[in-house]
């Protein structure tokens, strides 16, 4: 994954790997499967997509969401965490450019995975890690349109980890 500046405004956007860009229709099919309640088939398709394209953020995001719905925050944390890690790695390689607005389509899977990661961390009782993650991600888009800081700060229970 690489970073490209926007020509329209001073902002940056993730450019996803070619293998991920070629599989956008597959993700649309997976979303339709999930809406139809065919989560097992959707999961198998997502696992296959990751076997073909390990850096496919959208596939990690969808698997993380499925894991959260199935009350498996540990698995969700793994998928969301991998997507967030890939995003931060690309940012570091590009010299940590900013801003990185959620409003750009290429950035949405990263931010949505970060929100999922915060949820999974909170469900696992890791409020400190959730807050650290929220702060790090919110710094990329100070508008914090997904409310990561509010989400991480509002959770009242759980151990710190």
Regions found by a protein language model. Name each.
Residues 59, 93, 147-148:
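TPR alpha-solenoid repeat register
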Residues 8-25, 99-109:
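TPR-adjacent "capping" and linker segments in tetratricopeptide-repeat scaffold/adaptor proteins
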Residues 36, 70, 124, 158-159:
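Structural motif corresponding to the intra-repeat A-B loop/turn of tetratricopeptide repeats
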Residues 56, 90, 127, 143-145:
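Residue-level recognition of tetratricopeptide repeat
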Residues 33, 67, 121, 155-156:
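Residue at a conserved register position within TPR or TPR-like alpha-solenoid repeats
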Residues 16-52, 116, 123:
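Alpha-helical segment of the N-proximal tetratricopeptide repeat
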